[in-house]
Amino acid sequence: VPAKLTVSRLYPEILDETAAAEADSVGESAVVFDDEAPAPGFISGKSGVRGSDIGSATHVFMQFCDFERFARDGAEDELCRLTDDGFISRKMAEIVDIRALERFRESTFFGRMRRAVRMEREFRFNSARAAKDFTADPELKKLLEESGTELIVQGVVDAVFEEADKTLVLVDYKTDRFTREQLRDSAECERILTERHSNQLTYYRDICGEIFGRKIDETYIYSLSLGREILIY
């Protein structure tokens, strides 16, 4: 039975934190990395609304919205439709960040997405990766290489789309929130997002490139808090 490890972000040294627990089963089990975040507080019944709850609710809208309806009718009307159709609970709908969604709707990046000739949204993948690539420990790396241990990396990419000129673009929506002081320096906010998520997006880019049979030309974060895209690669 494969061992499972759930983490919020993938990074190259993750096995160094779990090496002791996995040492007895090297070569016999796989470790599953799952980047999907746990349910927010309002879903699990906890009282109070946190910034992360607002971000999670807004991300659910992005997951299920119909782009053409959203573009034509606006965020509030599309949110009502998603609520009526059961995609979003009424409690969740109350805390969706409408202003952030309207900024996205009016952005040039959303225009690019709507003009795409191919669009894969909520693109789920499972990929076997060499375990040796997830440790900086020379001895553990050698042991894992000799044993041929693999990790099953699971993930969900928000969108991969192809433009008319064949450019293949990957985008991951991020709802990280910033303090007022941080928001005064947009370059610093971009640096924080890039530093926080670039490892995860490297895996996404490489794995999606393998699945699509060609390299991803551009990899972006779209920050709902900042209201713009950030080119990572």
Describe each model-derived feature in a short phrase:
Residues V1-Y233:
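Structural signature of nuclease core domains in nucleic-acid processing machines
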